[in-house]
From Swiss-Prot:
Membrane-crossing residue ranges in chain numbering: 2-22
Protein name: Cytochrome b6-f complex subunit 8
Taxonomic path: Bacteria, Bacillati, Cyanobacteriota, Cyanophyceae, Synechococcales
Gene Ontology terms: cellular component: cytochrome b6f complex; plasma membrane-derived thylakoid membrane
Keyword Mitochondrion on entry: no
Location(s), subcellular: Cellular thylakoid membrane
Organism: Prochlorococcus marinus (strain MIT 9303)
Function: Component of the cytochrome b6-f complex, which mediates electron transfer between photosystem II (PSII) and photosystem I (PSI), cyclic electron flow around PSI, and state transitions.
Length: 33
């Protein structure tokens, strides 16, 4: 179970970072980080 939880959190962080890159390249000014 611990391995599954770690894998799920890793996948969530990875997909979130991909989303940040995509939104950043879209030039949307609503989110400024």
């Amino acid at each position: 179970m611990l391995f599954t939880l770690a894998w799920a959190s890793l996948a969530a962080v990875f997909s979130f970072s991909i989303a940040m890159v995509v939104w950043g390249r879209n030039g949307d000014g609503s989110l400024n980080f």
